[in-house]
Amino acid sequence: MRQRTPFARPGLLASAALALVLGPLAVAAQEQAAPPKDPAAALEDHKTKTDNRYEPSLDNLAQQDVAALGAPEGIPALSDAQYNEANKIYFERCAGCHGVLRKGATGKALTPDLTRDLGFDYLQSFITYGSPAGMPNWGTSGELTAEQVDLMANYLLLDPAAPPEFGMKEMRESWQVHVAPEDRPTQQENDWDLENLFSVTLRDAGQIALIDGTTYEIKSVLDTGYAVHISRMSASGRYLFVIGRDGKVNMIDLWMKEPATVAEIKIGSEARSIETSKMEGWEDKYAIAGAYWPPQYVIMDGETLEPMKIQSTRGMIYDEQEYHPEPRVAAILASHYRPEFIVNVKETGKILLVDYTDLKNLKTTEIEAERFLHDGGLDGSHRYFITAANARNKLVVIDTKEGKLVAIEDTGGQTPHPGRGANFVHPTFGPVWATSHMGDDSVALIGTDPEGHPDNAWKILDSFPALGGGSLFIKTHPNSQYLYVDATLNPEAEISGSVAVFDTKAMTGDGSDPEFKTLPIAEWAGIAEGQPRVVQGEFNKDGTEVWFSVWNGKDQESALVVVDDKTLELKHVIKDERLVTPTGKFNVYNTMTDTY
Protein backbone atom coordinates (compact mmCIF):
# COMPACT_ATOMS: atom_id res chain seq x y z
CA MET A 1 0.00 0.00 0.00
CA ARG A 2 1.43 3.33 -1.03
CA GLN A 3 0.91 6.42 1.06
CA ARG A 4 -1.22 8.89 -0.88
CA THR A 5 -0.72 12.60 -0.80
CA PRO A 6 -3.40 15.18 -1.66
CA PHE A 7 -3.34 16.90 -5.01
CA ALA A 8 -0.63 19.55 -4.94
CA ARG A 9 -1.33 22.77 -6.74
CA PRO A 10 0.96 23.20 -9.77
CA GLY A 11 3.12 26.28 -10.12
CA LEU A 12 1.73 29.46 -11.62
CA LEU A 13 1.38 29.46 -15.38
CA ALA A 14 2.34 32.36 -17.55
CA SER A 15 -0.80 32.70 -19.64
CA ALA A 16 -4.39 31.64 -20.05
CA ALA A 17 -3.48 29.86 -23.29
CA LEU A 18 -1.06 27.59 -21.48
CA ALA A 19 -3.71 27.02 -18.81
CA LEU A 20 -6.15 25.76 -21.42
CA VAL A 21 -3.55 23.37 -22.82
CA LEU A 22 -2.75 21.88 -19.44
CA GLY A 23 -6.33 21.63 -18.19
CA PRO A 24 -9.07 23.72 -16.62
CA LEU A 25 -7.54 24.25 -13.22
CA ALA A 26 -8.23 27.31 -11.17
CA VAL A 27 -4.58 27.78 -10.41
CA ALA A 28 -3.79 28.04 -14.09
CA ALA A 29 -5.30 31.49 -14.16
CA GLN A 30 -3.92 32.75 -10.88
CA GLU A 31 -0.99 34.75 -12.25
CA GLN A 32 -3.05 36.28 -15.02
CA ALA A 33 -5.80 37.06 -12.49
CA ALA A 34 -3.28 38.86 -10.26
CA PRO A 35 -4.71 38.15 -6.82
CA PRO A 36 -4.01 40.89 -4.31
CA LYS A 37 -1.60 38.79 -2.28
CA ASP A 38 0.87 35.97 -2.82
CA PRO A 39 -1.20 32.95 -4.04
CA ALA A 40 0.52 30.46 -1.74
CA ALA A 41 -0.23 32.68 1.23
CA ALA A 42 -3.77 33.23 0.00
CA LEU A 43 -4.38 29.50 -0.29
CA GLU A 44 -2.96 28.90 3.16
CA ASP A 45 -5.25 31.56 4.59
CA HIS A 46 -8.17 30.03 2.71
CA LYS A 47 -7.81 26.70 4.50
CA THR A 48 -10.27 25.92 7.25
CA LYS A 49 -8.48 26.51 10.55
CA THR A 50 -9.12 24.28 13.54
CA ASP A 51 -9.13 27.27 15.86
CA ASN A 52 -11.77 29.27 13.97
CA ARG A 53 -14.39 30.79 16.26
CA TYR A 54 -17.90 30.71 14.91
CA GLU A 55 -19.80 33.99 14.80
CA PRO A 56 -23.58 33.82 14.17
CA SER A 57 -23.42 35.83 10.93
CA LEU A 58 -26.21 33.96 9.18
CA ASP A 59 -27.02 33.44 5.52
CA ASN A 60 -30.10 33.30 3.33
CA LEU A 61 -31.60 30.51 1.22
CA ALA A 62 -32.35 30.09 -2.45
CA GLN A 63 -36.12 30.53 -2.46
CA GLN A 64 -36.30 33.81 -0.58
CA ASP A 65 -36.02 37.30 -1.99
CA VAL A 66 -33.86 39.57 0.13
CA ALA A 67 -32.51 43.07 -0.23
CA ALA A 68 -28.85 43.25 -1.16
CA LEU A 69 -26.63 44.23 1.72
CA GLY A 70 -24.50 47.34 1.55
CA ALA A 71 -21.03 46.78 0.13
CA PRO A 72 -17.87 47.85 1.98
CA GLU A 73 -15.71 50.51 0.39
CA GLY A 74 -13.93 49.21 -2.69
CA ILE A 75 -16.35 46.31 -3.33
CA PRO A 76 -19.04 46.77 -6.01
CA ALA A 77 -22.59 46.69 -4.65
CA LEU A 78 -25.19 44.35 -6.15
CA SER A 79 -28.75 45.30 -6.98
CA ASP A 80 -31.52 43.38 -5.25
CA ALA A 81 -32.11 41.39 -8.46
CA GLN A 82 -28.41 40.54 -8.79
CA TYR A 83 -28.14 39.56 -5.14
CA ASN A 84 -31.15 37.25 -5.38
CA GLU A 85 -29.79 35.61 -8.53
CA ALA A 86 -26.43 35.03 -6.82
CA ASN A 87 -28.15 33.80 -3.69
CA LYS A 88 -30.12 31.27 -5.73
CA ILE A 89 -26.98 30.01 -7.49
CA TYR A 90 -25.12 29.72 -4.20
CA PHE A 91 -27.75 27.59 -2.50
CA GLU A 92 -28.32 25.43 -5.55
CA ARG A 93 -24.65 24.83 -6.36
CA CYS A 94 -22.41 25.76 -3.44
CA ALA A 95 -24.07 25.54 0.00
CA GLY A 96 -23.87 21.76 0.19
CA CYS A 97 -20.08 21.87 0.45
CA HIS A 98 -19.39 25.37 1.78
CA GLY A 99 -22.29 25.67 4.23
CA VAL A 100 -25.34 27.86 4.62
CA LEU A 101 -23.25 30.25 6.70
CA ARG A 102 -20.23 29.82 4.40
CA LYS A 103 -18.23 28.43 7.33
CA GLY A 104 -16.99 25.49 5.26
CA ALA A 105 -17.07 21.71 5.75
CA THR A 106 -16.46 19.53 2.70
CA GLY A 107 -15.43 22.73 0.92
CA LYS A 108 -13.38 25.59 2.31
CA ALA A 109 -14.83 28.46 4.30
CA LEU A 110 -16.05 31.38 2.17
CA THR A 111 -16.64 34.01 4.82
CA PRO A 112 -15.93 37.63 3.78
CA ASP A 113 -12.87 37.91 6.01
CA LEU A 114 -11.27 35.22 3.82
CA THR A 115 -12.72 36.04 0.41
CA ARG A 116 -11.80 39.73 0.59
CA ASP A 117 -8.18 38.78 1.16
CA LEU A 118 -8.31 36.49 -1.86
CA GLY A 119 -9.88 39.17 -4.02
CA PHE A 120 -12.28 39.25 -6.96
CA ASP A 121 -9.84 38.03 -9.62
CA TYR A 122 -8.77 35.00 -7.60
CA LEU A 123 -12.38 34.02 -6.87
CA GLN A 124 -13.34 34.51 -10.50
CA SER A 125 -10.53 32.22 -11.66
CA PHE A 126 -11.25 29.52 -9.09
CA ILE A 127 -14.97 29.45 -9.92
CA THR A 128 -14.16 29.33 -13.63
CA TYR A 129 -11.53 26.58 -13.64
CA GLY A 130 -12.22 24.51 -10.52
CA SER A 131 -9.64 22.10 -9.13
CA PRO A 132 -8.95 18.34 -9.09
CA ALA A 133 -9.69 18.36 -5.35
CA GLY A 134 -13.43 18.41 -5.98
CA MET A 135 -14.25 22.02 -6.90
CA PRO A 136 -16.24 21.89 -10.16
CA ASN A 137 -15.12 24.01 -13.10
CA TRP A 138 -18.34 25.99 -13.21
CA GLY A 139 -17.13 28.35 -15.93
CA THR A 140 -15.28 26.16 -18.41
CA SER A 141 -17.95 23.45 -18.18
CA GLY A 142 -20.59 25.96 -19.28
CA GLU A 143 -22.72 25.42 -16.18
CA LEU A 144 -22.30 29.11 -15.32
CA THR A 145 -21.92 31.90 -17.85
CA ALA A 146 -19.02 34.33 -17.63
CA GLU A 147 -21.44 36.93 -16.29
CA GLN A 148 -22.67 34.51 -13.61
CA VAL A 149 -19.09 33.68 -12.60
CA ASP A 150 -18.38 37.39 -12.17
CA LEU A 151 -21.59 37.76 -10.18
CA MET A 152 -20.66 34.92 -7.83
CA ALA A 153 -17.14 36.27 -7.29
CA ASN A 154 -18.68 39.62 -6.31
CA TYR A 155 -21.35 37.94 -4.14
CA LEU A 156 -18.72 36.09 -2.10
CA LEU A 157 -17.09 39.39 -1.17
CA LEU A 158 -20.29 40.57 0.51
CA ASP A 159 -21.66 39.76 3.94
CA PRO A 160 -24.32 37.04 3.95
CA ALA A 161 -27.92 37.76 4.93
CA ALA A 162 -29.82 36.04 7.75
CA PRO A 163 -32.18 33.10 7.03
CA PRO A 164 -35.36 32.53 9.03
CA GLU A 165 -36.03 29.71 11.47
CA PHE A 166 -38.44 26.91 10.56
CA GLY A 167 -40.30 25.33 13.47
CA MET A 168 -43.42 23.33 14.23
CA LYS A 169 -45.77 26.11 13.10
CA GLU A 170 -44.14 26.33 9.68
CA MET A 171 -43.95 22.55 9.33
CA ARG A 172 -47.61 22.03 10.15
CA GLU A 173 -48.60 24.76 7.72
CA SER A 174 -46.72 22.91 4.96
CA TRP A 175 -47.94 19.43 5.94
CA GLN A 176 -50.51 17.84 3.64
CA VAL A 177 -52.08 14.38 3.57
CA HIS A 178 -53.41 13.85 0.06
CA VAL A 179 -54.68 10.32 0.65
CA ALA A 180 -55.49 9.23 4.20
CA PRO A 181 -54.12 5.83 5.30
CA GLU A 182 -57.61 4.32 5.47
CA ASP A 183 -58.24 5.34 1.84
CA ARG A 184 -55.11 3.73 0.46
CA PRO A 185 -54.93 0.28 -1.18
CA THR A 186 -54.80 -2.80 1.02
CA GLN A 187 -52.68 -4.62 -1.58
CA GLN A 188 -50.57 -3.74 -4.60
CA GLU A 189 -52.90 -2.52 -7.37
CA ASN A 190 -50.36 -2.29 -10.21
CA ASP A 191 -48.32 -5.02 -11.90
CA TRP A 192 -44.96 -3.31 -11.47
CA ASP A 193 -41.95 -5.28 -10.28
CA LEU A 194 -41.47 -2.99 -7.31
CA GLU A 195 -38.32 -4.64 -6.01
CA ASN A 196 -36.48 -3.88 -9.25
CA LEU A 197 -37.87 -0.38 -9.63
CA PHE A 198 -35.45 2.57 -9.72
CA SER A 199 -36.17 5.99 -8.25
CA VAL A 200 -34.09 8.44 -10.28
CA THR A 201 -33.51 12.04 -9.21
CA LEU A 202 -34.18 14.61 -11.94
CA ARG A 203 -32.24 17.28 -10.13
CA ASP A 204 -33.01 20.60 -11.77
CA ALA A 205 -36.54 19.61 -12.78
CA GLY A 206 -37.66 19.07 -9.18
CA GLN A 207 -38.89 15.57 -10.04
CA ILE A 208 -38.12 11.88 -9.78
CA ALA A 209 -38.56 9.25 -12.47
CA LEU A 210 -39.72 5.74 -11.60
CA ILE A 211 -38.05 3.37 -14.07
CA ASP A 212 -38.58 -0.36 -14.55
CA GLY A 213 -35.27 -2.12 -13.91
CA THR A 214 -36.05 -4.90 -16.40
CA THR A 215 -37.66 -3.11 -19.36
CA TYR A 216 -35.99 0.31 -18.80
CA GLU A 217 -39.41 1.91 -19.26
CA ILE A 218 -40.07 5.21 -17.52
CA LYS A 219 -43.21 4.23 -15.64
CA SER A 220 -43.91 7.63 -14.11
CA VAL A 221 -42.45 11.07 -13.46
CA LEU A 222 -43.51 12.71 -10.20
CA ASP A 223 -43.11 16.26 -8.95
CA THR A 224 -41.05 16.60 -5.77
CA GLY A 225 -38.94 19.20 -4.00
CA TYR A 226 -35.99 20.80 -5.74
CA ALA A 227 -32.90 18.65 -6.37
CA VAL A 228 -33.95 15.48 -4.55
CA HIS A 229 -30.90 14.39 -2.60
CA ILE A 230 -31.87 10.84 -1.70
CA SER A 231 -34.69 8.32 -1.97
CA ARG A 232 -35.33 5.93 0.90
CA MET A 233 -37.72 3.02 1.26
CA SER A 234 -39.95 2.05 4.13
CA ALA A 235 -38.97 -1.28 5.69
CA SER A 236 -42.03 -2.90 4.11
CA GLY A 237 -41.06 -1.74 0.63
CA ARG A 238 -44.39 -0.01 0.10
CA TYR A 239 -43.57 3.65 0.63
CA LEU A 240 -40.90 5.68 -1.13
CA PHE A 241 -39.64 8.76 0.72
CA VAL A 242 -37.73 11.47 -1.11
CA ILE A 243 -36.29 14.72 0.21
CA GLY A 244 -35.28 17.74 -1.84
CA ARG A 245 -32.52 20.15 -1.02
CA ASP A 246 -35.30 22.68 -0.37
CA GLY A 247 -36.45 20.58 2.61
CA LYS A 248 -39.58 19.17 0.99
CA VAL A 249 -40.41 15.53 1.76
CA ASN A 250 -42.68 13.47 -0.48
CA MET A 251 -44.15 10.14 0.64
CA ILE A 252 -45.11 8.05 -2.40
CA ASP A 253 -47.34 4.96 -2.20
CA LEU A 254 -46.00 2.39 -4.67
CA TRP A 255 -49.04 0.12 -4.18
CA MET A 256 -51.41 2.53 -5.93
CA LYS A 257 -52.43 1.76 -9.49
CA GLU A 258 -50.57 4.92 -10.44
CA PRO A 259 -48.06 5.57 -7.63
CA ALA A 260 -48.46 9.08 -6.28
CA THR A 261 -47.60 11.35 -3.37
CA VAL A 262 -49.93 10.55 -0.46
CA ALA A 263 -48.35 12.97 2.03
CA GLU A 264 -45.83 15.81 1.98
CA ILE A 265 -44.16 18.26 4.33
CA LYS A 266 -41.40 20.85 4.34
CA ILE A 267 -39.00 20.38 7.26
CA GLY A 268 -36.67 23.32 6.70
CA SER A 269 -35.16 25.53 4.04
CA GLU A 270 -32.14 23.36 3.21
CA ALA A 271 -32.02 19.59 3.77
CA ARG A 272 -30.35 16.35 2.68
CA SER A 273 -31.48 13.29 4.66
CA ILE A 274 -34.51 11.07 5.29
CA GLU A 275 -34.88 7.58 6.78
CA THR A 276 -37.55 5.26 8.20
CA SER A 277 -37.64 2.96 11.22
CA LYS A 278 -36.44 -0.59 10.49
CA MET A 279 -36.18 -2.35 13.85
CA GLU A 280 -38.36 -5.46 14.07
CA GLY A 281 -41.74 -4.47 15.47
CA TRP A 282 -41.23 -0.83 14.48
CA GLU A 283 -41.23 -1.17 10.69
CA ASP A 284 -42.83 1.85 8.96
CA LYS A 285 -43.76 3.38 12.33
CA TYR A 286 -41.67 6.55 11.99
CA ALA A 287 -39.79 8.62 9.46
CA ILE A 288 -37.01 11.07 10.30
CA ALA A 289 -35.63 13.94 8.24
CA GLY A 290 -32.59 16.11 8.88
CA ALA A 291 -32.08 19.73 7.85
CA TYR A 292 -29.05 21.79 6.96
CA TRP A 293 -31.07 24.90 7.81
CA PRO A 294 -32.30 25.31 10.42
CA PRO A 295 -29.89 22.76 11.94
CA GLN A 296 -32.38 20.23 13.29
CA TYR A 297 -34.08 16.90 12.74
CA VAL A 298 -37.75 16.00 12.94
CA ILE A 299 -39.39 12.65 13.68
CA MET A 300 -42.66 12.14 11.81
CA ASP A 301 -45.50 9.64 11.72
CA GLY A 302 -44.56 6.92 9.24
CA GLU A 303 -47.99 6.83 7.56
CA THR A 304 -48.84 10.52 7.34
CA LEU A 305 -45.62 12.54 7.85
CA GLU A 306 -47.26 14.40 10.72
CA PRO A 307 -44.38 16.16 12.54
CA MET A 308 -44.11 14.81 16.07
CA LYS A 309 -40.73 15.81 17.51
CA ILE A 310 -38.25 18.49 16.44
CA GLN A 311 -34.75 18.53 17.92
CA SER A 312 -32.20 21.27 17.28
CA THR A 313 -28.59 20.21 16.73
CA ARG A 314 -27.04 23.57 17.63
CA GLY A 315 -24.45 23.22 20.34
CA MET A 316 -20.83 22.78 21.25
CA ILE A 317 -18.11 21.40 18.98
CA TYR A 318 -17.03 18.13 20.56
CA ASP A 319 -13.30 18.89 20.81
CA GLU A 320 -13.00 22.67 21.05
CA GLN A 321 -16.09 23.11 23.24
CA GLU A 322 -17.01 26.23 21.28
CA TYR A 323 -20.58 27.02 20.24
CA HIS A 324 -21.52 26.39 16.62
CA PRO A 325 -24.65 27.99 15.12
CA GLU A 326 -24.94 25.69 12.10
CA PRO A 327 -24.28 22.01 12.92
CA ARG A 328 -25.99 20.54 9.88
CA VAL A 329 -27.65 17.13 9.90
CA ALA A 330 -25.91 14.95 7.32
CA ALA A 331 -26.44 11.18 6.92
CA ILE A 332 -29.23 9.44 8.84
CA LEU A 333 -29.51 5.65 9.00
CA ALA A 334 -31.84 3.29 10.83
CA SER A 335 -30.35 0.67 13.13
CA HIS A 336 -31.21 -2.98 12.47
CA TYR A 337 -30.23 -3.90 16.04
CA ARG A 338 -31.98 -1.27 18.15
CA PRO A 339 -35.04 0.98 17.78
CA GLU A 340 -32.76 3.91 17.01
CA PHE A 341 -31.93 6.38 14.29
CA ILE A 342 -28.24 7.13 13.70
CA VAL A 343 -27.83 10.86 13.05
CA ASN A 344 -24.62 12.51 11.84
CA VAL A 345 -24.19 16.11 13.03
CA LYS A 346 -21.63 17.55 10.68
CA GLU A 347 -19.92 20.57 12.25
CA THR A 348 -19.96 19.53 15.92
CA GLY A 349 -18.57 16.07 15.14
CA LYS A 350 -21.23 14.17 17.06
CA ILE A 351 -23.17 11.04 16.15
CA LEU A 352 -26.56 10.80 17.83
CA LEU A 353 -28.29 7.49 18.51
CA VAL A 354 -31.92 8.57 18.83
CA ASP A 355 -34.20 6.07 20.60
CA TYR A 356 -37.66 6.37 19.04
CA THR A 357 -39.57 4.11 21.45
CA ASP A 358 -40.79 7.02 23.59
CA LEU A 359 -40.85 10.42 21.92
CA LYS A 360 -42.23 12.13 25.03
CA ASN A 361 -39.21 10.98 27.02
CA LEU A 362 -36.68 11.05 24.23
CA LYS A 363 -33.41 9.28 24.97
CA THR A 364 -30.36 10.10 22.88
CA THR A 365 -26.84 8.71 23.06
CA GLU A 366 -24.33 11.37 22.02
CA ILE A 367 -21.07 9.96 20.67
CA GLU A 368 -18.03 12.19 20.24
CA ALA A 369 -16.67 11.22 16.86
CA GLU A 370 -14.93 13.68 14.52
CA ARG A 371 -15.87 16.97 12.94
CA PHE A 372 -17.38 17.38 9.48
CA LEU A 373 -19.26 14.09 9.47
CA HIS A 374 -20.94 13.55 6.13
CA ASP A 375 -22.11 10.32 4.53
CA GLY A 376 -21.57 6.64 5.28
CA GLY A 377 -23.19 3.22 5.45
CA LEU A 378 -23.38 -0.12 7.21
CA ASP A 379 -20.94 -3.00 6.93
CA GLY A 380 -22.05 -6.30 5.45
CA SER A 381 -23.46 -7.53 8.79
CA HIS A 382 -25.49 -4.31 9.22
CA ARG A 383 -24.08 -4.04 12.74
CA TYR A 384 -21.38 -1.41 12.22
CA PHE A 385 -21.93 2.10 10.86
CA ILE A 386 -18.91 3.49 8.99
CA THR A 387 -19.00 7.17 8.17
CA ALA A 388 -16.65 9.77 6.72
CA ALA A 389 -15.55 12.90 8.54
CA ASN A 390 -14.48 14.15 5.18
CA ALA A 391 -12.80 17.48 5.94
CA ARG A 392 -10.71 15.65 8.58
CA ASN A 393 -9.92 12.73 6.22
CA LYS A 394 -11.16 10.19 8.76
CA LEU A 395 -13.50 7.22 8.96
CA VAL A 396 -15.52 6.73 12.13
CA VAL A 397 -16.89 3.31 13.13
CA ILE A 398 -19.92 2.90 15.43
CA ASP A 399 -21.18 -0.40 16.87
CA THR A 400 -24.95 0.01 16.49
CA LYS A 401 -25.64 -3.09 18.59
CA GLU A 402 -23.65 -1.85 21.60
CA GLY A 403 -24.23 1.84 20.90
CA LYS A 404 -20.63 3.00 21.15
CA LEU A 405 -17.61 4.29 19.25
CA VAL A 406 -15.31 1.56 17.94
CA ALA A 407 -12.60 3.34 15.94
CA ILE A 408 -11.48 6.49 14.16
CA GLU A 409 -9.03 5.95 11.31
CA ASP A 410 -7.27 8.29 8.90
CA THR A 411 -7.95 7.14 5.33
CA GLY A 412 -4.62 8.36 3.97
CA GLY A 413 -6.53 10.28 1.28
CA GLN A 414 -8.12 13.69 1.02
CA THR A 415 -11.84 14.26 1.64
CA PRO A 416 -13.37 10.77 1.68
CA HIS A 417 -16.84 10.73 0.12
CA PRO A 418 -18.18 7.17 0.18
CA GLY A 419 -21.90 7.65 -0.36
CA ARG A 420 -22.96 4.53 1.51
CA GLY A 421 -19.66 2.84 0.74
CA ALA A 422 -19.05 -0.58 -0.78
CA ASN A 423 -18.81 -3.94 1.02
CA PHE A 424 -16.92 -6.90 -0.43
CA VAL A 425 -14.71 -9.82 0.61
CA HIS A 426 -11.06 -9.16 -0.20
CA PRO A 427 -9.04 -12.29 -1.16
CA THR A 428 -6.40 -11.47 1.48
CA PHE A 429 -8.00 -9.18 4.04
CA GLY A 430 -11.47 -10.71 4.29
CA PRO A 431 -14.57 -8.48 4.57
CA VAL A 432 -13.81 -4.82 3.87
CA TRP A 433 -15.68 -1.57 3.27
CA ALA A 434 -14.41 0.87 0.65
CA THR A 435 -14.50 4.63 0.17
CA SER A 436 -13.29 6.86 -2.63
CA HIS A 437 -12.23 10.50 -2.20
CA MET A 438 -13.17 13.90 -3.55
CA GLY A 439 -9.77 15.45 -2.98
CA ASP A 440 -7.48 12.88 -4.60
CA ASP A 441 -7.61 9.76 -6.73
CA SER A 442 -7.39 7.20 -3.93
CA VAL A 443 -9.63 4.37 -2.80
CA ALA A 444 -9.23 3.19 0.81
CA LEU A 445 -10.24 -0.17 2.30
CA ILE A 446 -11.04 -0.71 5.98
CA GLY A 447 -11.41 -4.16 7.55
CA THR A 448 -14.89 -4.93 8.93
CA ASP A 449 -14.70 -8.43 10.43
CA PRO A 450 -13.61 -8.28 14.09
CA GLU A 451 -14.55 -11.93 14.67
CA GLY A 452 -13.16 -13.66 11.59
CA HIS A 453 -10.25 -11.31 10.88
CA PRO A 454 -9.55 -9.52 14.17
CA ASP A 455 -6.06 -8.36 13.15
CA ASN A 456 -7.53 -6.47 10.19
CA ALA A 457 -10.62 -5.05 11.87
CA TRP A 458 -11.06 -1.27 11.77
CA LYS A 459 -7.69 -0.63 10.14
CA ILE A 460 -6.98 0.96 6.76
CA LEU A 461 -5.63 -2.09 4.96
CA ASP A 462 -4.97 -0.72 1.49
CA SER A 463 -5.05 2.46 -0.56
CA PHE A 464 -4.74 2.60 -4.33
CA PRO A 465 -5.45 5.05 -7.17
CA ALA A 466 -8.52 5.21 -9.38
CA LEU A 467 -9.24 7.62 -12.26
CA GLY A 468 -8.79 10.94 -10.49
CA GLY A 469 -10.01 13.30 -7.82
CA GLY A 470 -13.61 14.43 -7.58
CA SER A 471 -15.19 11.06 -6.80
CA LEU A 472 -18.63 11.07 -5.21
CA PHE A 473 -19.63 7.40 -5.17
CA ILE A 474 -18.18 3.92 -5.00
CA LYS A 475 -20.33 0.85 -5.57
CA THR A 476 -20.45 -2.94 -5.64
CA HIS A 477 -23.02 -5.68 -4.95
CA PRO A 478 -22.88 -9.07 -3.18
CA ASN A 479 -23.36 -10.79 -6.56
CA SER A 480 -20.67 -8.74 -8.33
CA GLN A 481 -16.90 -9.16 -8.34
CA TYR A 482 -16.39 -5.58 -9.52
CA LEU A 483 -15.92 -2.27 -7.71
CA TYR A 484 -17.00 0.87 -9.59
CA VAL A 485 -15.59 4.34 -8.82
CA ASP A 486 -16.76 7.59 -10.42
CA ALA A 487 -14.92 10.94 -10.67
CA THR A 488 -17.91 13.22 -11.16
CA LEU A 489 -16.39 16.51 -10.01
CA ASN A 490 -13.07 16.18 -11.83
CA PRO A 491 -12.60 19.21 -14.12
CA GLU A 492 -11.21 17.10 -16.98
CA ALA A 493 -14.09 16.02 -19.21
CA GLU A 494 -12.59 12.65 -20.11
CA ILE A 495 -12.21 11.75 -16.43
CA SER A 496 -15.56 13.08 -15.21
CA GLY A 497 -17.24 11.22 -18.08
CA SER A 498 -15.75 7.82 -17.17
CA VAL A 499 -15.63 5.31 -14.31
CA ALA A 500 -12.89 3.03 -13.03
CA VAL A 501 -13.70 -0.66 -12.51
CA PHE A 502 -11.61 -2.91 -10.27
CA ASP A 503 -11.77 -6.71 -10.16
CA THR A 504 -11.99 -7.41 -6.42
CA LYS A 505 -11.09 -11.08 -6.91
CA ALA A 506 -7.76 -10.06 -8.45
CA MET A 507 -6.74 -7.83 -5.54
CA THR A 508 -3.64 -9.16 -3.80
CA GLY A 509 -3.01 -7.07 -0.71
CA ASP A 510 0.76 -7.29 -1.29
CA GLY A 511 1.27 -3.54 -1.55
CA SER A 512 0.93 -3.36 -5.32
CA ASP A 513 -1.80 -1.21 -6.82
CA PRO A 514 -4.62 -3.15 -8.48
CA GLU A 515 -5.22 -2.30 -12.11
CA PHE A 516 -8.54 -0.89 -13.23
CA LYS A 517 -10.47 -0.77 -16.47
CA THR A 518 -11.85 2.57 -17.65
CA LEU A 519 -15.42 2.58 -18.95
CA PRO A 520 -16.18 5.64 -21.17
CA ILE A 521 -19.76 5.99 -19.96
CA ALA A 522 -20.41 9.49 -21.34
CA GLU A 523 -19.02 8.43 -24.72
CA TRP A 524 -21.31 5.40 -24.71
CA ALA A 525 -24.25 7.70 -24.05
CA GLY A 526 -23.56 9.45 -27.35
CA ILE A 527 -24.01 12.97 -26.00
CA ALA A 528 -22.21 15.59 -28.05
CA GLU A 529 -22.98 18.77 -26.09
CA GLY A 530 -21.84 20.18 -22.76
CA GLN A 531 -19.58 18.40 -20.29
CA PRO A 532 -21.71 15.44 -19.20
CA ARG A 533 -20.58 14.08 -15.84
CA VAL A 534 -21.02 10.44 -14.86
CA VAL A 535 -22.33 9.93 -11.35
CA GLN A 536 -23.32 7.15 -8.95
CA GLY A 537 -23.38 3.57 -10.07
CA GLU A 538 -26.47 1.72 -8.83
CA PHE A 539 -27.09 -2.01 -9.23
CA ASN A 540 -30.33 -3.70 -10.13
CA LYS A 541 -31.80 -6.08 -7.58
CA ASP A 542 -29.90 -9.15 -8.81
CA GLY A 543 -26.55 -7.40 -9.17
CA THR A 544 -26.31 -8.24 -12.87
CA GLU A 545 -26.43 -4.67 -14.17
CA VAL A 546 -25.11 -1.35 -12.93
CA TRP A 547 -26.71 1.95 -13.95
CA PHE A 548 -24.91 5.29 -14.30
CA SER A 549 -26.32 8.79 -14.70
CA VAL A 550 -24.83 10.91 -17.46
CA TRP A 551 -25.60 14.30 -15.96
CA ASN A 552 -25.59 17.33 -18.23
CA GLY A 553 -26.94 20.89 -18.08
CA LYS A 554 -30.64 21.48 -17.59
CA ASP A 555 -31.15 22.53 -21.20
CA GLN A 556 -28.88 19.81 -22.59
CA GLU A 557 -29.33 16.12 -23.29
CA SER A 558 -28.69 13.68 -20.44
CA ALA A 559 -29.01 9.91 -20.24
CA LEU A 560 -28.81 6.76 -18.14
CA VAL A 561 -26.30 4.11 -19.18
CA VAL A 562 -26.75 0.46 -18.20
CA VAL A 563 -23.62 -1.72 -18.02
CA ASP A 564 -23.55 -5.52 -18.03
CA ASP A 565 -21.72 -6.40 -14.81
CA LYS A 566 -20.38 -9.71 -16.17
CA THR A 567 -18.88 -8.40 -19.40
CA LEU A 568 -18.37 -4.71 -18.45
CA GLU A 569 -19.90 -3.83 -21.82
CA LEU A 570 -22.65 -1.39 -22.71
CA LYS A 571 -26.07 -2.98 -22.41
CA HIS A 572 -28.54 -0.15 -22.85
CA VAL A 573 -28.85 3.64 -23.02
CA ILE A 574 -32.00 5.29 -21.69
CA LYS A 575 -32.74 8.64 -23.31
CA ASP A 576 -35.92 10.63 -22.94
CA GLU A 577 -36.74 14.33 -22.96
CA ARG A 578 -38.10 13.86 -19.44
CA LEU A 579 -34.66 12.81 -18.14
CA VAL A 580 -33.59 16.30 -17.08
CA THR A 581 -30.33 16.35 -15.08
CA PRO A 582 -30.53 12.76 -13.75
CA THR A 583 -28.25 12.24 -10.76
CA GLY A 584 -28.97 9.82 -7.89
CA LYS A 585 -30.58 6.45 -8.57
CA PHE A 586 -32.03 4.16 -5.93
CA ASN A 587 -33.07 0.57 -6.57
CA VAL A 588 -36.04 -0.23 -4.32
CA TYR A 589 -34.79 -3.61 -3.08
CA ASN A 590 -31.18 -2.57 -2.51
CA THR A 591 -32.26 0.60 -0.72
CA MET A 592 -34.85 -1.21 1.41
CA THR A 593 -32.37 -3.89 2.51
CA ASP A 594 -29.24 -1.71 2.82
CA THR A 595 -27.48 -3.73 0.12
CA TYR A 596 -24.31 -2.00 -1.06
Curated annotation (Swiss-Prot):
Binds 1 heme c group covalently per subunit. It catalyses: nitric oxide + Fe(III)-[cytochrome c] + H2O = Fe(II)-[cytochrome c] + nitrite + 2 H(+); A + NH4(+) + H2O = hydroxylamine + AH2 + H(+). Keywords: Electron transport, Heme, Iron, Metal-binding, Oxidoreductase, Periplasm, Signal, Transport. Heme c binds at residues 46, 94, 97-98, 108, 122. Residues 163-596 are annotated as: D1-heme domain. Its EC number is 1.7.2.1, 1.7.99.1. The keyword NADP does not apply. It is an enzyme of class 1 (oxidoreductase). Residues 1-29 form the signal peptide. It is found in: Periplasm. Inactivation of this cytochrome oxidase results in the loss of nitrite and nitric oxide reductase activities, but not of nitrous oxide reductase activity. Homodimer. This is Nitrite reductase. The gene is nirS.
